[in-house]
């Protein structure tokens, strides 16, 4: 009997094993939709970004006006730009929910998949930061100045590293040009890393909401989960387009409508909303180098999760105290996001410091509580 083309063609076979005949656990919930939603976000960002790059000019005298030109003169340029800017917000919403799902259900036990995922998170954050600089508004310029300046905290190499990154003695034309270059290339690197992420995931198969081995009870990915994913696509695209058409600048910063001026500092420099929790952690450490280390650790600490796994069950579905701690940590991150947008004054500074300690404590106390709970049940 002849095999279907999808099983015999060397190229189609790869896609078939990843998207059609992939055995998937029968009980995975909507929390497992965010992986495919992230793929959709990445495709939207690459396509809209490609068309924006055709009309954008990476020059400090022209960048702001080229973005203005895109919005005013290019056919549907306003739509491309607002889709791209708000698409980034949706990308981060999906990433944070995806990571949160991974922490809750113990998906970090797939060590290589998890580590690649954290690297992808770092790459996406770098891409988004550089993209924010490109319109060359006030917040773009000052955000770039403040964040790149953090590298000067590195002992011995700091200042040289900053000047090398800037391509001069200040954020200038060379900085904008290289940021545009990296902003263009990084999404394709993210795409390649995503392939590796999936490759590692498909070695082990997906986790599921009860955290048990589901090999005896699996169903093909298509049609069951392809349709389930399409429902997720429709919901996300509906919300994204509603935001883009009703309030496209809701998540942006008003300061970025002012062309960059090195002589005027904005009253309150802050990044986009999806970086505010990390920015609050950075600001809560009085020492510059300490702040930079805390900033990097706020994401890098996710990498330690696979290595200190002490629990008998996968995930925290069966650990009530850990569930309370998990949701408390989520509230902590939301409060840190709020603090990051507040001015540097009391009581915000103290609240930020307390929340930072609580945030990092979660990763240290959580495995100990699971161990204690397991001993209690013995």
From Swiss-Prot:
Its main location: mitochondrion. GO terms for molecular function: metal ion binding; ubiquinol-cytochrome-c reductase activity. GO terms for cellular component: membrane; mitochondrial inner membrane; respiratory chain complex III. GO terms for biological process: mitochondrial electron transport, ubiquinol to cytochrome c; spermatogenesis. It is found in: Mitochondrion inner membrane. Keywords: Electron transport, Heme, Iron, Membrane, Metal-binding, Mitochondrion, Mitochondrion inner membrane, Respiratory chain, Transmembrane, Transmembrane helix, Transport, Ubiquinone. It is a multi-pass membrane protein. Its cofactor is heme b. Heme b b566 binds at residues 98, 197. A ubiquinone binds at residue 202. Pfam families: Cytochrom_B_C (PF00032), Cytochrome_B (PF00033). It comes from the Eukaryota. Component of the ubiquinol-cytochrome c reductase complex (complex III or cytochrome b-c1 complex) that is part of the mitochondrial respiratory chain. The b-c1 complex mediates electron transfer from ubiquinol to cytochrome c. Contributes to the generation of a proton gradient across the mitochondrial membrane that is then used for ATP synthesis. The main subunits of complex b-c1 are: cytochrome b, cytochrome c1 and the Rieske protein. This is Cytochrome b.
């Amino acid at each position: 009997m002849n095999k279907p083309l999808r099983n015999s063609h060397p190229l189609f076979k790869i896609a078939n094993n990843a998207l059609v005949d992939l055995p998937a656990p029968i009980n995975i919930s909507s929390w497992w939709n965010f992986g495919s939603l992230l793929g959709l976000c990445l495709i939207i960002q690459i396509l809209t970004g490609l068309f924006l790059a055709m009309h954008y000019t990476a020059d400090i005298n022209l960048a702001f006006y080229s973005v203005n030109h895109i919005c005013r003169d290019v056919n549907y340029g306003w739509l491309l730009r607002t889709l791209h800017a708000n698409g980034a917000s949706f990308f981060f919403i999906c990433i944070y929910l995806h990571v949160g799902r991974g922490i809750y259900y113990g998906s970090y036990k797939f060590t290589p998949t998890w580590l690649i995922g954290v690297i992808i998170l770092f790459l996406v954050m770098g891409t988004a930061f550089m993209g924010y600089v490109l319109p060359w508004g006030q917040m773009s310029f000052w955000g770039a100045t403040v964040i790149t300046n953090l590298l000067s905290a590195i002992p011995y190499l700091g200042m040289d590293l900053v000047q090398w990154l800037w391509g001069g003695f200040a954020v200038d034309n060379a900085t904008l040009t290289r940021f545009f270059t990296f902003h263009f290339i990084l999404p394709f690197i993210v795409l390649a890393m995503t392939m590796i992420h999936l490759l590692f995931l498909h070695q082990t198969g997906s986790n599921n909401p009860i955290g048990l081995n589901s090999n005896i009870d699996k169903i093909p990915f298509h049609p069951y989960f392809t349709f389930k994913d399409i429902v997720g696509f429709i919901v996300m695209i509906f919300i994204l387009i509603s935001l883009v058409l009703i309030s496209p600048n809701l998540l942006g910063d008003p300061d970025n409508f002012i062309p960059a001026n090195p002589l005027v500092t904005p009253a309150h420099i802050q990044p986009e909303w999806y970086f505010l929790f990390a920015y609050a952690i950075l600001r809560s450490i009085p020492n510059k180098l300490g702040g930079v280390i805390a900033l990097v650790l706020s994401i890098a600490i996710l990498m330690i999760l696979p290595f200190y796994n002490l629990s008998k069950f996968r995930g925290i579905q069966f650990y009530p105290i850990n569930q309370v701690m998990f949701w408390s940590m989520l509230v902590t991150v939301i409060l840190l996001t709020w603090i990051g947008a507040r001015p540097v004054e009391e009581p915000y500074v103290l609240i930020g410091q307390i929340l930072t300690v609580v945030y990092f404590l979660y990763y240290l106390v959580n495995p100990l509580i699971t161990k204690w709970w397991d001993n209690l049940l013995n």
